[in-house]
Amino acid sequence: MQIRALVLTAVALAVAGCTSVTVRPVSASVQLHNVCIVNNPKVIVSDFVPVLRDGFARHHIATSVVDQSQAQACVVTVTYTALRSWDFKPYLSHAELRLWRDGMQIGFAEYHLNGKGGYDLGKWRGTKSKMDPVIDQLLATQNGG
């Protein structure tokens, strides 16, 4: 009986707690209306930018995608990185969002699968289902939040 309980506990620990989310939301004193998403050509998660744009749109914030050279013309920018891992098929394993205004960071969000998800079958969920809650926490103080 003790072995069975030990095995069940080990499985529960392997599956639970696999995702880590850290968010420093944008202050309520900052109202965002338009944000430039600085394109990161190193990111190969094909649906990441569309998910990001949808998330900002949910909070009534317009976005445009710009290259690094065009970012200086923007008042507020968001930079991002996203990594994928493989286990039978690719999945999002890490992402970071940083919001900037006048060279100062005004928000930060990180999604991370600890141990690349281990046995957690949720690791194969889509980018949208993983990032929507993270974006919503980041922008919780904004119009749509």
Stretch-by-stretch model annotation:
Residues 2-10, 14-62, 143-145:
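A structural "domain/chain start" motif
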Residues 19-28, 53-57, 108, 112-145:
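C-terminal/domain-edge helix-coil "capping" segments
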Residues 33, 59, 76, 93-95, ...:
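Envelope-exposed proteins and targeting segments
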Residues 36, 65, 107-108:
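Structural recognition of the beta-strand scaffold that forms the well-ordered cores
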Residues 40, 68, 81, 111-112:
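Active-site-proximal beta-strand/loop segments in catalytic clefts of secreted hydrolases
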Residues 41-49, 88-90, 120-131:
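Solvent-exposed, acidic/flexible segments
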Residues 65-84, 90, 96:
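A short, hydrophobic beta-strand-centered structural micro-motif
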Residues 89-115:
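Amphipathic beta-strand/beta-sheet edge segments enriched in Tyr/Trp
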